[in-house]
Amino acid sequence: EQASAFMGAGLLYGQTIIVQREFDAEDWLRLVDKYEASSTFSAPALVRMICALPEEVKERYDRSSMRVMVANAAPWSYALKQRYVADFPPGSLFEVYGSTELGVDTVLMPEDQMRKPGSCGKPAPGIEIMLVDDDGNEVTGTGPDHHGEVFVRSNSAFDTYYKNDVGYESNSRGDFHTVGDIAYRDDEGYLYICDRKTDLIISGGMNIYPAEIEAALEQHPGIYDVAVFGIPSEQWGEVVHATVVRSPGSSLTGGEITAFAREHLASYKVPRSVDFTDELPRTGSGKLLKRQLRAPYWAGRTAQVG
């Protein structure tokens, strides 16, 4: 859906659209160089592959034409943004938060990418955002301790789901609608997405957001990609687990990962177990299929929190 919107806008303004039949990181750079491509959009997984190419490969291609890179589909970690601005014009990076149902809701401008790590920006023009706590009250405070579910009022929002009015209405509060993301605001009005409500880990009564742990672990040079989720624990209900893709040439161990996590995270957020894989399951657009990683651990259980 997002691809259609971006390409449609490009055609409307008379731009040339360049389409890869199948993603290949070096070929993507070749196309940018050949056609002097000036704007694009991407999920983090694809940009991670581009930035991970050897320096001698990247240096073969001119990337200076890129004026707009829209980060979408999933949050880009601060570490990935640092890699991107080292390889591309720093003023080209924009980040948006939104969904199929609600459209584009926030925008983080290039000048704020390094200044506001973890933020997805401020409400886009014509967008109203309300945060609602677990008791149904509007959240008015700022900072990580004042988080709530994100509800959006937008003229581009769906009227309903196809043949599922009840499902859509259950995610609505009047003219405001949600897709289940949890966030907080800072004192300048910037929004920070904590995680999807369904990905929340509840361990010993503590709420843990996997996205925070993933962002911290991605700072380790030996970690190429990582997914964090909850697995069953008789004692705690759930505990934190990390599935890691090592960087090329890395021999990183689980013990080294947990030691690194202890330096950057509160003790209850440190992964209690780690495993390794060659590749994380993702959709064609690069979205992580975390449910596929979780499923084997929760097979035969009726709930994900004991």
Go through the PLM ranges and name each one:
Residues M7, L12-Q15, L29, K34-S42, ...:
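Gly/Ser/Thr-rich phosphate-binding loop
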Residues D24, A45-V47, W76, A157:
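Alpha-helix capping/helix-boundary segments
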Residues V32, T40, G148, S154-N155, ...:
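AMP-binding/adenylate-forming catalytic core of the ANL superfamily
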Residues A73, G98, G121, D181, ...:
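Active-site glycine-centered loops adjacent to acidic/histidine catalytic or metal-binding residues
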Residues L93-E101, G121-P123, F229-P232, D275:
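Beta-strand->loop->alpha-helix junctions that form or flank phosphate-binding loops
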Residues Q113-S119, E169-N171:
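Short, P/G- and charge-enriched loop/turn segments at secondary-structure junctions
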Residues K122-G126, N137-S170, I208:
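Conserved ATP/PPi-binding loop(s) of AMP-dependent carboxylate-activating enzymes
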Residues A295-G306:
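Acidic/polar alpha-helix N-cap and adjacent early helical turns
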